[in-house]
Amino acid sequence: MIERGKFRSLTLINWNGFFARTFDLDELVTTLSGGNGAGKSTTMAAFVTALIPDLTLLHFRNTTEAGATSGSRDKGLHGKLKAGVCYSMLDTINSRHQRVVVGVRLQQVAGRDRKVDIKPFAIQGLPMSVQPTQLVTETLNERQARVLSLAELKDKLDEMEGVQFKQFNSITDYHSLMFDLGIIARRLRSASDRSKFYRLIEASLYGGISSAITRSLRDYLLPENSGVRKAFQDMEAALRENRLTLEAIRVTQSDRDLFKHLISEATDYVAADYMRHANERRVHLDQALAFRRELYTSRKQLAAEQYKHVDMARELGEHNGAEGSLEADYQAASDHLNLVQTALRQQEKIERYEADLEELQIRLEEQNEVVAEAAEMQDENEARAEAAELEVDELKSQLADYQQALDVQQTRAIQYNQAISALARAKELCHLPDLTPESAAEWLDTFQAKEQEATEKLLSLEQKMSVAQTAHSQFEQAYQLVAAINGPLARSEAWDVARELLRDGVNQRHLAEQVQPLRMRLSELEQRLREQQEAERLLAEFCKRQGKNFDIDELEALHQELEARIASLSDSVSSASEQRMALRQEQEQLQSRIQHLMQRAPVWLAAQNSLNQLSEQCGEEFTSSQEVTEYLQQLLEREREAIVERDEVGARKNAVDEEIERLSQPGGAEDQRLNALAERFGGVLLSEIYDDVSLEDAPYFSALYGPSRHAIVVPDLSQIAEQLEGLTDCPEDLYLIEGDPQSFDDSVFSVDELEKAVVVKIADRQWRYSRFPSLPIFGRAARENRIESLHAEREVLSERFATLSFDVQKTQRLHQAFSRFIGSHLSVAFEDDPEAEIRRLNGRRVELERALATHESDNQQQRLQFEQAKEGVSALNRLLPRLNLLADETLADRVDEIQERLDEAQEAARFVQQYGNQLAKLEPVVSVLQSDPEQFEQLKEDYAWSQQMQRDARQQAFALAEVVERRAHFSYSDSAEMLSGNSDLNEKLRQRLEQAEAERTRAREALRSHAAQLSQYSQVLASLKSSYDTKKELLNDLQRELQDIGVRADSGAEERARQRRDELHAQLSNNRSRRNQLEKALTFCEAEMENLARKLRKLERDYHEMREQVVTAKAGWCAVMRMVKDNGVERRLHRRELAYLSADELRSMSDKALGALRLAVADNEHLRDVLRLSEDPKRPERKIQFFVAVYQHLRERIRQDIIRTDDPVEAIEQMEIELSRLTEELTSREQKLAISSRSVANIIRKTIQREQNRIRMLNQGLQSVSFGQVNSVRLNVNVRETHATLLDVLSEQQEQHQDLFNSNRLTFSEALAKLYQRLNPQIDMGQRTPQTIGEELLDYRNYLEMEVEVNRGSDGWLRAESGALSTGEAIGTGMSILVMVVQSWEDEARRLRGKDISPCRLLFLDEAARLDARSIATLFELCERLQMQLIIAAPENISPEKGTTYKLVRKVFQNTEHVHVVGLRGFAPQLPETLPGTQTEDTPSEAS
């Protein structure tokens, strides 16, 4: 039995009232008794300070300086010390019987802050005979002693043999030593742990149920599952590292793409410029040769152009002299044509206007008659409308008067007045003063007859008016015709003049008939004259071109000679044309073939490059497509074998991973179902109980238990019998062992140990022989050893798998390269070299071009002679038909004679044309000019007077008719008849009024209609008169203008004038055309000469410059080639397919690559500077330097441990394969690292169940504790509802939330926090991050709620709160909980410390007088049962039956304050035994 460590004594040195006092501590209860201020709290403060020397925690509330402003800094410690060095030391003896003295040196720090300096220390190996006071004091004499400083104490202890002194700079180290030596129950690693320990001591010191303790019971009682947390942290760290590695791989892949892009663009940039310079060098050589050939050709052309210029200048001078006379003749002919055209247009206008005037004259006469008729009709309509208006007004007046009279019974008087009024009006109009109603009817007949007579007379005058008007218009028309022909004349002379004009018109018409024959004759003669002049001009021109004068008789012989020459030259030209066509056709065929080959050459070169790459990659040479396909089949077989081997290694690696994963399960359970069953049965796995077995014992225990090594240990087998019924989800063999998991041993079997084997006697008739396994996995150490060996094996397998994966991917990429080659290049890769064929065809093309140039020169001379002969024949063909015209000399005189006769005939034709129509109209009406009708005006006046008379007669007849109608109004018989008559009269008046109003409406409508019609007729008449007058004036003006022109306008004059003008224009145009041709040719010749001269100068300059450039470029090109060959990059740069691109295409390719390179090297200062220098077009070697720098830059970044090549291109290919393999491997590793949510829930549930069982065991120790009415105390541990829901979801519904746990963006902790928020949206998470919340959720303690309950009196179990308990009950309950906490700490620390140490247990209790005797006795009993030490402070002696009691009395002696201490050991029947060291009072003395 391991003895528990004990505190032996407490020593106070130089404290307030205690100079050198040692309190021996009882093994159970030490009581400090005394009044107020006796020093009880100081003694306990010294103990606590030595136990927890942390000034941030120490705070002694029972201080004499309460309320002081510096109290917050003092914390109650400064006032308990004396000036100088102070000590507080604890003398302990642990379970190993080692004496350890731990303590602190305290010293007040001068200043206003009242600070205290604390230095912890420890002393080991001190003999039991040495007292603590002897160590730190030095006796000066009988009455004086001195306190040693810490340095002096160290020196003193160094002199003692076997004594170790340790001074600590950190409280953590101090507490670590105390924990290791069994002085404190818990390892205090941090300030948080020290705070918990201090709160525990403080809670016990002041008694009661501490709220700080009860609120944090989980932290005090439940141990931190650091292993699980660390496992999760390691898992997340591994996942994070894995993801960072994947991200780094992605970055590396991006860098690989960047490097690949850099190589590609750098190659395009430099190779395009390299090939462009190579092409330009070849082009410059060709240009230099072309310049030299063109220079010689241009000199020949210049000499020929100079000869040609002299001939054209002479001919141009002759044409300039002839152009002046032709221009004058052409201008005269143009003017004459314009006059003739003007006269013809004038004549046409005159004829058109005369026809218009005749038509207007007829329309004007007709319109006059229409207007006259319309005016008469208008007068009648006006009279009818006035009469209708008067009648309506009269009837309305009568009807109105009648209505008024009818209303006042005076109708008769009104009607009589109306009749009188009508009678008076009739008298006035008819001039009949004696008119009566009786005679009105007779007068009505008379006036109606008068109206009829006036109407008849008006009609008679209207007929006479019409006849007179017709005669008058005929005379006027004839008179106007005579005046138009002869001009103004008297009306009396019109007859004579008209007859003379008719006789003259007959003669003029006869002459006019001869115009057309004369004109045709003249036109014929003029045409012959012009042909004669043209023949003379052609003859002169022909003689000029031939260079000699020819007679007319010699022309036919010359024509035959030229035709013979043309025939001979034509054969030569045609044969030359065929020969030239054949040469050109062959040249075109060659050019087409070369173009076809040039188009095929890049494809062939690309195929060759691809074939060379394949040959380099596989180390084989291919000469035919069959060899390529055969090698591809070999690749497929090799790839299949590698894949099979890789899959075998991968399967073994996966098996190792699965075994590692199985062995890494917590508790050593190889089957997850065992954990669930253990939780279900309330048991513990046997492997978990033996988890701490050593590696040496693992084979023995593995053989001992054999197949039952995975059994479940349950407290009672009988209680789970029912649960075994229907159990299916379990291993095939499930072993159950009955036993206490807390104190399980291997006594369940009878076993005999043999050599490397055991014999287990399971029953009397059943034994089991088991050998020790060579690879035991029973116990954590064995599993870790096995896991370590498996990890080593896995590393070897991983390396082999990586190598095989690399080989497989390399083979696959090679297979893909062969497949691409077969699909893209196989058809052309093994064809003949097109470049060699191009060189051969180019040589033949040069020969053809030379032959064509020679042929063209010879053919040009023959063609020139042929053209000259054809031109001479053409001129003679135009001359020979006109030889008879050249001999006719009287042609010009005949033309002049016919011209005079034509002029006379044209003058007569113009007279007939001008006045022929007027004469034809005058001839039938000339007889009306003999008499002039002057009585027309008198007839018009008579007609108007008759019209007025008819209107007056009509009005008189209407007035008399009204009187006759009103005759009934003049007499009435009586009033009744009058009323009856009135009614009839009223009706008649209304009917007449309606008829009169209708008649008035019709009259008004007719009046308006006829008025509009009359207005329209009048307007038309005015328009016709105006148009007639205007056209008459225009006709007179046109006739005067025609006379002013002075040209006879006949039908053939315009044609002759136009023909003459056109002939002159043709001659002038031909002359000008020839002159322009000569001028242009001369200008062109001069320009050509100037261009040739300038071209010669330029060619000479270009030729010399090109020669210099070729020579200079040759030197630069040699330097470039030397640099390319020295650096071994010619294969990369000399890309033959680029030779077929133009300079612009290559420059564009280089510029595009340059733009991409600027972006690619923007972050690399060295490459950026080299690239900037390489942009100089005059220094092509700098581009080579840049390309070399890029390759060197990439070579430096090749990891030679992974990639074994110096070529960056090959390195990139290998890097791509390696990165792909790493990505695949890391992705699978991430999937294996990720823990399932079900596993997390099981781990947390299992931990919670284990801790609940542990708390249940701790509760058993509290069942017998009672204080006052408190019969028992217990702890309740419950799982929070929200967290229980989380566990359920994690274990059973995890599929619904895979979006969280499968996310690569979230760690497991963050996913867990997101799930918790999703399940509990009502909970505010504050400002905490998901990672922090997730880490809290991985701690099982946050899932539990703990509370203290007491069984008090009749109330039963209640929640332990200070308000529900008495002071003594609260103190006892709190002490019980603190004891439980200490015991829990010890259990937790047992795994961290040696099992041979049982730590000290000590608690405090201040003001213990508040407890009754029973409670004190219970405390004593609790301390005895739990082997716990207790220090109690009380004002009065509490009379303990056991333990040690110190009586403290503070006294003043000689102005010096000190505490008098008396110690007693228990109260027994015998006298109390005086404890050693307490017989004399403690007399303080000043330190020297």
UniProtKB/Swiss-Prot annotation:
Entry keyword set:
ATP-binding, Cell cycle, Cell division, Chromosome partition, Coiled coil, Cytoplasm, DNA condensation, DNA-binding, Nucleotide-binding
Compositionally biased residues, Basic and acidic residues: 1051-1065
Q: Which GO terms describe its cellular component?
A: cytoplasm; nucleoid
Q: Where is this region: Flexible hinge?
A: 666-783
**Which residues lie within the region annotated Disordered?**
1049-1074
- Residues binding ATP are G34, G35, N36, G37, A38, G39, K40, S41
Q: Does the keyword NAD apply?
A: no
Q: Which Gene3D superfamilies match?
A: 1.10.287.1490, 1.20.58.850, 3.40.1140.10, Immunoglobulin FC, subunit C, MukB, hinge domain
Q: Which residues form a coiled coil?
A: 326-418, 444-472, 509-602, 835-923, 977-1116, 1209-1265
The record ties this protein, via Pfam families, to: MukB, MukB_hinge, SbcC_Walker_B
GO molecular-function annotation terms? ATP binding; DNA binding
Keyword Zinc-finger on entry = no
Tell me, what is an example of a GO biological process annotation in this record? chromosome condensation
The record's comment on protein family reads: Belongs to the SMC family. MukB subfamily.
The subunit structure is: Homodimerization via its hinge domain. Binds to DNA via its C-terminal region. Interacts, and probably forms a ternary complex, with MukE and MukF via its C-terminal region. The complex formation is stimulated by calcium or magnesium. Interacts with tubulin-related protein FtsZ.
- The protein, known as: Chromosome partition protein MukB
